[in-house]
Amino acid sequence: NRSTPESPLGNLSADGLIWAAKHFHNVDADVAVYNSGGVRANIAKGDVTLGDVYAAFPFDNALSILTITGKNLKRLMYKVPFDLYVNKEVKLVSNSSGWVSSITVNGQQIDDNKTYTVATIDYISDNDAYTDILGNPIDREDSVEMIRDYLGEYFKYLADQNNGNITGAVDGRVIIQ
């Protein structure tokens, strides 16, 4: 459901960006954000095919790894209740109007003066709606590979680790009070 701040597949997608940054680019990203409009279909219970992954993630988006300030990361996190999925290390509390009262990454408040590594998609890195928020990243690396290919590999990895099972969940990353 693209109108909610969390979905099982949206959460898996954001976690998959963290995994892809680490496994394919040797980068330990602090945060991942995936736009909710980029997830276009659900994946039904049962065997997951490449066609299922392509239907869910039909756009030719690349992985974009950004280094940004904590101040700009906070600004990006304010968009989460409206249209972004985040990785499990992020906890965000907002009211129904979108006012964010709490954001933590790995249990810590975001430090305006610290730098953070963000795994996202080039759609977010290049989209005017986000570039004004992100400012000029301190560093940026874009992949040649498409996100859907990374996510397909992530789903295989999860299946291998969990006796063939992949389970997405809504787990309280984003709480609307």
Label for each model-derived stretch:
Residues 1-6:
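Glycine-rich phosphate/diphosphate-binding loops and the adjacent beta-loop-alpha structural elements
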Residues 7, 11-177:
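Feature captures C-terminal
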